[in-house]
């Protein structure tokens, strides 16, 4: 007979897994206390690196069932979640996600659901990258500068270029402006590329 386990995770110590436990009970699952793993750890940590999840994997056997309230309990992103579900499926452990109607993620329908979710996540990631690149290009076109401010203002940079053209050493110029040689070399390189 299949044993039923539950994995509940929250990100901070101020949060509680109580709502997740109640949701699992309301769905009709009576989880024994020793089969309920509760963890306070950031969702940005891969499931394979979470102490509680590792303990859960050590306790589970072929034919067991794992219940989670939401997919994000199983990993930090779509790829991590898929890897976790595949790892569990390879051990013949079924995974049910209540937020997806209790579908078994290791079944054909569950795998299809996972593929759709992965595709949507990839699409969202691509859109975010596209918007980021577009925003950077727009900012550059309006003259926005990126990075930290220059150590030397425009007037100082013009003086540095004049000193370089006069044959004064880079080290002497750096000492004069109380800055690094690298800063003076950057001013020189910027002047040469203009």
From Swiss-Prot:
Residues 3-143 form the Resolvase/invertase-type recombinase catalytic domain. SUPFAM superfamilies: Homeodomain-like (SSF46689), Resolvase-like (SSF53041). CDD domains: HTH_Hin_like (cd00569), SR_ResInv (cd03768). PROSITE patterns: RECOMBINASES_1, RECOMBINASES_2, RECOMBINASES_3. Signal peptide: none annotated. Belongs to the site-specific recombinase resolvase family. Tn2501 is a cryptic class II transposon found as part of the lactose transposon Tn951. This is Transposon Tn2501 resolvase. The gene is tnpR.
């Amino acid at each position: 007979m299949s044993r039923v386990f539950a994995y509940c995770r929250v990100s901070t110590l101020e949060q509680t897994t109580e709502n997740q436990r109640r949701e699992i009970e309301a769905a009709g699952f009576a989880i024994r206390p020793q089969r309920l793993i509760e963890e306070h750890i950031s969702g940005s940590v891969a499931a394979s690196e979470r102490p509680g999840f590792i303990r859960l994997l050590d306790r589970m056997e072929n034919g067991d069932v794992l219940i989670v309230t939401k997919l994000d309990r199983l990993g930090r992103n779509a790829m991590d979640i898929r890897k976790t579900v595949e790892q569990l499926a390879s051990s013949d452990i079924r995974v049910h996600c209540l937020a997806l109607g209790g579908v078994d993620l290791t079944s054909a329908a569950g795998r299809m659901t996972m593929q759709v979710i992965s595709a949507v996540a990839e699409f969202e990631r691509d859109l975010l990258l596209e918007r980021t690149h577009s925003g950077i290009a727009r900012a550059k076109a309006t003259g926005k500068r990126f990075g930290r401010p220059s150590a030397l203002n425009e007037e100082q940079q013009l003086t540095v270029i004049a000193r370089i053209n006069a044959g004064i050493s880079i080290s002497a110029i750096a000492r004069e402006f109380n800055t690094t040689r690298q800063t003076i070399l950057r001013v020189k390189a910027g002047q040469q590329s203009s």
